[in-house]
């Protein structure tokens, strides 16, 4: 769902509802592979004005429940549940603070296995929302540390600012790229990040670069050649869409995207997508909608 500035006042007042924004990787370079399988990367994260919504209702039974299951993901493996349990355990072990239970409902719009960070974003929103609802009073740094134990991409969603990421993705430096319009194309397949990491072979000598050095050249994603080779539908889509603009992969896929200076131009190409191929147009944002909502709620004390 698109986050609309016209609805921002309503989103701020209904404190049970929290946005969970998508992200894109404007570029992604693999610079090495650790013995444990983790990949050293350099990438630039930017948020989209589009994403999921999570609804939180605290309960007295101290149980954590996800009301609507996400197809293909067992509840115990869901990052929302893992994030909530992580915060609950941390508060008990480190603060001797017994938190209440919670029922969580998700309105899912970010495609699963699309490289838009839906699971990581959901986990980050859960940590931030429950930090407020349970009155944990933890800092963003502490929440980011908790998130990092669950998923590498979670901290960038906790901080809510576009960033240049290094290491295995955990070293973040603030960076503000231009806020352009993006056409996101959603192929009808899901791609497992773990599967791609296991298959990826680093066959080049990579050098660490600054973010500005990457931005001086055409942007690319090092996972794209392998994914195009293994998923013919993505290769065909990129070939077809290259008639209109330069498209590239975000994350480990499956979604591909292109950037535009105007929303009108992006929508013009959206309407040229092949039948049964979905997509949407969104503005890139350097401050996530979640961070905006949290700031406004805090300023107006609507969370107290």
From Swiss-Prot:
Pfam families, per database record: GHMP_kinases_C, GHMP_kinases_N
EC number, UniProt record? 2.7.1.148
GO process annotations (BP)? isopentenyl diphosphate biosynthetic process, methylerythritol 4-phosphate pathway; terpenoid biosynthetic process
According to its UniProt record, in which pathway does this protein act?
A: Isoprenoid biosynthesis; isopentenyl diphosphate biosynthesis via DXP pathway; isopentenyl diphosphate from 1-deoxy-D-xylulose 5-phosphate: step 3/6
Q: Where is the signal peptide?
A: none
- Could you tell me what reaction this enzyme catalyses? 4-CDP-2-C-methyl-D-erythritol + ATP = 4-CDP-2-C-methyl-D-erythritol 2-phosphate + ADP + H(+)
Example GO molecular function term?
4-(cytidine 5'-diphospho)-2-C-methyl-D-erythritol kinase activity
Residues annotated for ATP binding in this entry: 111-121
Q: Could you name the domain of life of the organism this protein comes from?
A: Bacteria
Output the InterPro entries linked to this UniProt entry: GHMP_kinase_C_dom (IPR013750), GHMP_kinase_C_sf (IPR036554), GHMP_kinase_N_dom (IPR006204), IspE (IPR004424), Ribosomal_Su5_D2-typ_SF (IPR020568), Ribsml_uS5_D2-typ_fold_subgr (IPR014721)
| Keyword set, alphabetical order | ATP-binding, Isoprene biosynthesis, Kinase, Nucleotide-binding, Transferase
Which residues carry out catalysis?
A: 23, 153
Question: Which cysteine residues pair off into disulfide bonds?
Answer: none
Job description of the protein: Catalyzes the phosphorylation of the position 2 hydroxy group of 4-diphosphocytidyl-2C-methyl-D-erythritol.
This protein's assembly is summarised as: Homodimer.
Q: Which family does it belong to?
A: Belongs to the GHMP kinase family. IspE subfamily.
Q: Which NCBIfam families match?
A: ispE
Name of this chain's protein = 4-diphosphocytidyl-2-C-methyl-D-erythritol kinase
Q: Which organism is it from?
A: Wigglesworthia glossinidia brevipalpis
């Amino acid at each position: 769902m698109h986050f609309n500035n016209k609805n921002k006042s309503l989103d701020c007042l209904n404190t049970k509802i929290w946005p969970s924004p998508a992200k894109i990787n404007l570029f992604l370079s693999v610079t090495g592979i650790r013995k444990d399988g983790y990949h050293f990367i350099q990438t630039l994260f930017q948020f989209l004005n589009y994403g999921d919504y999570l609804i939180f209702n605290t309960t007295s039974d101290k149980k954590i429940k996800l009301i609507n299951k996400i197809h293909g993901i067992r509840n115990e493996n869901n990052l929302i549940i893992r994030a909530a349990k992580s915060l609950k355990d941390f508060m008990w072990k480190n603060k001797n603070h017994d938190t209440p239970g919670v029922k969580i409902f998700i309105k899912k719009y970010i495609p699963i296995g699309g490289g838009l960070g839906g699971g990581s974003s959901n986990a980050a929103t859960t940590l931030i929302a429950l930090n407020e609802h349970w009155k944990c009073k933890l800092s963003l740094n502490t929440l980011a540390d908790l998130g990092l134990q669950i998923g590498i991409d979670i901290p960038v969603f906790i901080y809510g600012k576009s960033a240049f990421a290094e290491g295995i993705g955990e070293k973040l430096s603030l960076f503000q790229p231009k806020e352009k319009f993006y056409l996101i194309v959603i192929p009808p397949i899901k791609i497992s990040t773990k599967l791609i990491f296991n298959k990826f072979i680093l066959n080049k000598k990579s050098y660490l670069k600054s973010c500005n050095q990457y931005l001086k050249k055409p942007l690319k994603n090092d996972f794209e050649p392998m994914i195009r080779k293994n998923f013919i539908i993505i290769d065909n889509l990129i070939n077809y869409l290259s008639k209109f603009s330069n498209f590239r992969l975000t994350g480990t896929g499956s979604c591909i995207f292109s950037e535009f200076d105007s929303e009108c131009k992006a929508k013009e190409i959206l309407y040229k997508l092949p039948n049964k191929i979905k997509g949407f147009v969104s503005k890139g944002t350097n401050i996530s909608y979640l961070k905006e909502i949290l700031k406004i709620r805090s300023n107006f004390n609507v969370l107290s």
